[in-house]
Amino acid sequence: MNRFENKIIIITGAAGGIGASTTRRIVSEGGKVVIADYSREKADQFAAELSNSGADVRPVYFSATELKSCKELITFTMKEYGQIDVLVNNVGGTNPRRDTNIETLDMDYFDEAFHLNLSCTMYLSQLVIPIMSTQGGGNIVNVASISGITADSNGTLYGASKAGVINLTKYIATQTGKKNIRCNAVAPGLILTPAALNNLNEEVRKIFLGQCATPYLGEPQDVAATIAFLASEDARYITGQTIVVDGGLTIHNPTINLV
C-alpha cells in the first residue's frame, strides 16, 4: 500500500513518540517526510536510520514556541521538495509544575503553553494553506488530546489549548474545504510513549487501563495509523472531525463491577 507515493509530508515533533511512529508509518507507505523537531540531534539520528532503509526524509530544527521557526520550516520544505501535501501538527505538551489547577496555575506560562499547543498549529496551517491551494489541495491533521474534550484536576492550560485545536480544526475545514483542503484532528488518550512510560508509574497505568473499554492501553502506532488514514485519500469525505483514540476511556462514566 503506497497511499503517500509522491507526497510531501511535514510532521512536527517527528523524532519521538507519536511523531516518530507517524513518520515510520507514512514512509512505509511511500511518503517523503520532513522530520521537524526541537532536538536536531534526535532528528538527524532518526533521519539517518530511515534513510539507511531507503526512505526519503529531511531533518530540520523546529521550535514550536517561535513564529520565526514556523516560517523557516515551510521555507525549508519548499526549498527541498517544492511542494507540501500534508501537514501533521503533532508537536505539543505542557509543564506539569506550572500548568496545575485554575487556582494555582502559573499565568506567566499562559503564552508559552498556548503558543506550543495552539498558536503554532494555527500559524503553520496559515502558511501551508496558500501552497496547498495553488497545488490543487492538501491535508492538515492536528494532534489534539482528550484533555481538550474532558477535564482533569490539573493541566488546565493544556486542556484549554487543546480544546482550541479541536475547534480550530473545524474552522480550517470550513474555510478551506472548497479549495480541496481537508483538516481533521486526532485526540489521543493515554498512549504509551517513552515519555508516558518514564513519567507514569505502573499504578497510574493500571487505573487508566481499568477505565478503558479495551483490555490494553494505546501504543504510538495506534495514533499513527489514525493520522495516516485521515491524511490519505481513504478519508477523502471526512473533514472537520476529531477522532478520539483512547480505547474507549471517555465513552462512559467511571464504572465498577458490582457483580
UniProtKB/Swiss-Prot annotation:
The record marks 145 as: Transition state stabilizer. Pfam families: adh_short_C2. It catalyses: cholate + NAD(+) = 3alpha,12alpha-dihydroxy-7-oxo-5beta-cholanate + NADH + H(+); chenodeoxycholate + NAD(+) = 7-oxolithocholate + NADH + H(+); taurochenodeoxycholate + NAD(+) = 7-oxotaurolithocholate + NADH + H(+); glycochenodeoxycholate + NAD(+) = 7-oxoglycolithocholate + NADH + H(+). It is an enzyme of class 1 (oxidoreductase). Glycochenodeoxycholate binds at residues 145, 158. NCBIfam families: PRK07231.1. The gene is hdhA. GO terms for molecular function: cholate 7-alpha-dehydrogenase (NAD+) activity. 7alpha-hydroxysteroid dehydrogenase involved in the metabolism of bile acids in the gut. Catalyzes the NAD(+)-dependent oxidation of the 7alpha-hydroxy group of 7alpha-hydroxysteroids, such as cholate, chenodeoxycholate, taurochenodeoxycholate, glycochenodeoxycholate, taurocholate and glycocholate, to the corresponding 7-oxosteroids. The active site is at 158 (proton acceptor). This is 7alpha-hydroxysteroid dehydrogenase. Optimum pH is pH 8.5 (NAD reduction, bile acid oxidation) and 6.5 (NADH oxidation, bile acid reduction). Keywords: Bile acid catabolism, Lipid degradation, Lipid metabolism, NAD, Oxidoreductase, Steroid metabolism. CDD domains: SDR_c. The record marks 162 as: Lowers pKa of active site Tyr. Is relatively thermostable, retaining 95% of initial activity after 1 hour at 65 degrees Celsius. Its EC number is 1.1.1.159, 1.1.1.-. It comes from Bacteroides fragilis (strain ATCC 25285 / DSM 2151 / CCUG 4856 / JCM 11019 / LMG 10263 / NCTC 9343 / Onslow / VPI 2553 / EN-2).
